[in-house]
C-alpha cells in the first residue's frame, strides 16, 4: 500500500522492522491502519501524563524526550533518531510516560495506533522476543552507564555517557558514523 499523501510505501517500511518477521500477509492489518506523518514545525506528539495513542517509527528527523526541572524549565533528556521507535512502552504499559515526546521540524514518521499494535502482538506472539531485545538493548546501556558512574570520575562519566548515546543512536540508524544530538543542558541533566 502506498500512503496517498506522501507516496511512501508503508509496507516496505514495515517490512524492514520487527513486523517484517511475520511476513507480508500478517502485516496487512497494520498496513491498513498505518499513516505517514510529516511535521514542518517542531510538534508535541504526546504530553507528559498522557498515554501515547500511536507507536511511531521515526523516518527522518528526530524525537526529543523532554522533562521538566523542579524550577519548571524544560530539559531534553534523550533523542530518538531515524529508525527508532516512539515508544514501545505505550503498547505494553498502562501508566503514562512522565515526559513529553516532541518531534523536530522537517521530520517524518510512520504512525500505528497503539490498540492495533496490541492486537497484532496478541495475534503474533513471536514478535515479543524481538521487541524485548530492542527495549533490552537500551536498558542494558542505561544500567551499564549508571553502574559505572558510581565508580568513575566526572570526566569518565561524561565520556561513558557520550559513548552510550552514540551506541544507541548508531544502532537506530545502522550507520558507521553518527551525528550525536547533544546539548550542554542535556549533558548537565
Ranges and model annotations:
Residues 1-168:
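Cytosolic regulatory regions built on CNB/CRP/Popeye-like sensor folds
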Residues 165-189:
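Phosphate-/nucleic-acid-contacting segments
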Amino acid at each position: 500500500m502506498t500512503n496517498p499523501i506522501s507516496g511512501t510505501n508503508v509496507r516496505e517500511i514495515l517490512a524492514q522492522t520487527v513486523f517484517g518477521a511475520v511476513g507480508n500477509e500478517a502485516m496487512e492489518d497494520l498496513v491498513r491502519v498505518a499513516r505517514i506523518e510529516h511535521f514542518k514545525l517542531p510538534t508535541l506528539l504526546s504530553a507528559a501524563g498522557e498515554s501515547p495513542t500511536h507507536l511511531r517509527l521515526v523516518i527522518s528527523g528526530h524525537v526529543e524526550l523532554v522533562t521538566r526541572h523542579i524550577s519548571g524549565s524544560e530539559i531534553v533528556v534523550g533523542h530518538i533518531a531515524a529508525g527508532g521507535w516512539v515508544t514501545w512502552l505505550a503498547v505494553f504499559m498502562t501508566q503514562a510516560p512522565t515526559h513529553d515526546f516532541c518531534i523536530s521540524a522537517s521530520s517524518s514518521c510512520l504512525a500505528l495506533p497503539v490498540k492495533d499494535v496490541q492486537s497484532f502482538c496478541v495475534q503474533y506472539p513471536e514478535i515479543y522476543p524481538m521487541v524485548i531485545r530492542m527495549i533490552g538493548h537500551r536498558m542494558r546501556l542505561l544500567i551499564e552507564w549508571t553502574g559505572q558512574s558510581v565508580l568513575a570520575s566526572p570526566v569518565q562519566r561524561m565520556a561513558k555517557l557520550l559513548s552510550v548515546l552514540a551506541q544507541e543512536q548508531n544502532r537506530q540508524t545502522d550507520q558507521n558514523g553518527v551525528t550525536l544530538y547533544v546539548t550542554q543542558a542535556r549533558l548537565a541533566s
